[in-house]
């Protein structure tokens, strides 16, 4: 159903490079406007309908709600994340221009690639491959996560969404030794089946894993994340994606490993199949 090859890796790299060139951080409103416009169009190209919620004081970074509803689908997978990135403070300490994607030593370097431009780009590429799968998809994105999500905290409780059967975090995590850190909570039979499948995949690939019943770390704390506060509730939650110990999110020489993209693709396929049956 899902495929990931070198062509997909290059497309992901190109998309991420383009977004990075916009410099989409709060002090550059034009960059946030450019990236939000491009993301909206890419969702539309994948067959999603779009709703935006605009802050009158910051119209350049709307909340984006992308929906794809399929006749006959019984389940809905929800995703959440953000399209803004952290500004660069210690630019002189970077080994390359943080606003240009640099491919070096099997990693892509650039501000925001791990948090979370590349994970978002990969998902859009995979969504484009899903044409007839009986599964509803929802993606909620904000453009102010790096400044504490003030408008999202106000608006997310008011968003009218259908019942979501599984919420997937903006990304996941792998350790330096290659082990995957699988983060989840609100466990039920469905997520146990998914977990068993991910564990089996890791065993086949001789990859270790650690299970943590908690959400992904948040810069402002989980108690201040609008997604965890107002979207997830008691719905099963899972964090998977290509970030790792070398990503140095918010730090100097932020990077991501493209070699983890095929691994994540297989796990997304497992999830989509489980919820479309």
Model regions and ranges:
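Acidic/histidine-rich catalytic neighborhood of metal-dependent amide-processing enzymes
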Residues: 112-186
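Catalytic-loop motifs flanking and including active-site residues across diverse enzymes
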Residues: 115-122, 190, 224-228, 264
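N-terminal helical capping/dimerization or prosegment-like subdomains
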Residues: 1-91, 256-263, 269, 274
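Short secondary-structure junctions
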Residues: 45-54, 103, 203-216
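Active-site metal-coordination/substrate-binding segment of hydrolases
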Residues: 75-138
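Hydrophobic/aromatic beta-strand patches that form the interior of the parallel beta-sheet core
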Residues: 51, 77-79, 140, 166-168, ...
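An extended, acidic, His-containing surface patch that forms the Zn2+-binding/catalytic region
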Residues: 72, 176-177, 194-277
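Fold-independent oxyanion-binding glycine-rich loops
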Residues: 53, 81-83, 143-144, 170-172, ...
